[in-house]
């Protein structure tokens, strides 16, 4: 379940102390939270069939937002991969690997939702 996975990853990341890069980590946490909200809103739009057709017309920039979210996901994937390679702490490695898996799952979910909205 990606909802509990999000909560678990965010909790684990908030416990990490990465020294001078804690500001970067907070930024990653914020992006994860934003991504979760976006994924949830797309899922809700797909579930409510009335919104399925009104979302694109109500929000003319939804394709642009979708493209931006995919860019954010790609950036986060690269950042998480980099951090997983750099750390020697096994707790952090596991957390980053789980975050990477979650990002890939969420990317697929967003793709699925967006195809249903097109």
UniProtKB/Swiss-Prot annotation:
Cell compartment(s), UniProt: Virion; Host nucleus
Cystines in this chain: none
Keywords from the named record: Host nucleus, Host-virus interaction, Transport, Virion
Pfam families for the chain: Flu_NS2
Tree of life domain: Viruses
GO biological process, one term: exit of virus from host cell nucleus through nuclear pore
Segments carrying motif Nuclear export signal: 9-18, 82-91
Other facts: Average number present in a viral particle is estimated to be 130-200 molecules.
Protein function: Mediates the nuclear export of encapsidated genomic RNAs (ribonucleoproteins, RNPs). Acts as an adapter between viral RNPs complexes and the nuclear export machinery of the cell. Possesses no intrinsic RNA-binding activity, but includes a C-terminal M1-binding domain. This domain is believed to allow recognition of RNPs to which the M1 protein is bound.
Official protein name in the record: Nuclear export protein
The organism of origin for this protein: Influenza A virus (strain A/Tern/South Africa/1961 H5N3)
